Amino acid sequence: MSAFSEAALEKKLSELSNSQQSVQTLSLWLIHHRKHSRPIVTVWERELRKAKPNRKLTFLYLANDVIQNSKRKGPEFTKDFAPVIVEAFKHVSSETDESCKKHLGRVLSIWEERSVYENDVLEQLKHALYGDKKARKRTYEQIKVDENENCSSLGSPSEPPQTLDLVRALQDLENAASGDAAVHQRIASLPVEVQEVSLLEKITDKESGERLSKMVEDACMLLADYNGRLAAEIDDRKQLTRMLADFLRCQKEALAEKEHKLEEYKRKLARVSLVRKELRARIQSLPDLSRLPNVTGSHMHLPFAGDIYSED
């Protein structure tokens, strides 16, 4: 991948489109350069505010993709986006229409469902998006309309994934957190003192207490990071399950279509074969003109009309 620079990032952000491929491509580039997460977030926020209203939502889609897909690599982006994400939500919400707010609400729901941020940050995001509005009362008819729309959207099948995307998702899971033997060993080797509250009574001086505190902090960081990676792996496996289901559905539909086509062409072959058989039989029943006498090439003289009708 190309080297990181703020100028390169600004250029890539200026070329960012609303397509899934564009967002995912830039997201992968950013995650690859995650050691520059702080300047990346700074440039992202600056360019977000400069972007036209119809492009601002795409910036948040990019942030969402980076935050969620970088979790298995490390917590850098989740932490560095946290101080600016609330104001970013507020800015985009104030600059765009209600349709855009619905999409922002969907992103927020996913973050809440997957515990991307702590509850206090999620509450701030809700306030930035919805303000102090209370749930408005709706008539029974309005509720039924919303339910029907939701059912319709949930029931509509997803687009099947490209084969390359499916292969990439499977390859990503080859290095999943659950297979990290080194971390498993580190967790298994944690001293019992960091896991049993009852053992705190054995601390008799400040020095040993501070030493244990350092061990507990390290254990917390190790376990929190690994839990985050496992949560990301679970999300990846859920996504892969959906991708496989969509792919299988698509293949079943394609199979049914091709079987139908095969039957159709079998019938056509049968009709053409019948024509060929009948044609061969008809050809066999016709006279062979090549066996008739060659009238034009012989020396036989045909009689003249006068000879035929002459009187004796």
Curated annotation (Swiss-Prot):
Family named by the database record: Belongs to the UPF0400 (RTT103) family.
GO cellular component: nucleus; transcription preinitiation complex
List of residues that carry Phosphoserine: 153, 156, 285
Protein name: Regulation of nuclear pre-mRNA domain-containing protein 1A
SUPFAM superfamilies from the UniProt entry: ENTH/VHS domain
UniProt lineage: Eukaryota, Metazoa, Chordata, Craniata, Vertebrata
Role according to the record: Interacts with phosphorylated C-terminal heptapeptide repeat domain (CTD) of the largest RNA polymerase II subunit POLR2A, and participates in dephosphorylation of the CTD by RPAP2. May act as a negative regulator of cyclin-D1 (CCND1) and cyclin-E (CCNE1) in the cell cycle.
Ranges in coiled-coil conformation: 244-286
Domain CID: 2-133
Location relative to the cell: Nucleus
Entry-linked Pfam families: CID (PF04818), CREPT (PF16566)
Sequence intervals crossing the membrane: none
SMART domains: RPR
Subunit structure: May form a heterodimer with RPRD1B. Associates with the RNA polymerase II subunit POLR2A (via CTD phosphorylated at 'Ser-2' and 'Ser-7' of the heptad repeats).
Annotated GO biological process: RNA polymerase II promoter clearance
GO MF annotations, alphabetized: RNA polymerase II C-terminal domain binding
CDD domains for the chain: CID_RPRD1A
Species the sequence originates in: Mus musculus
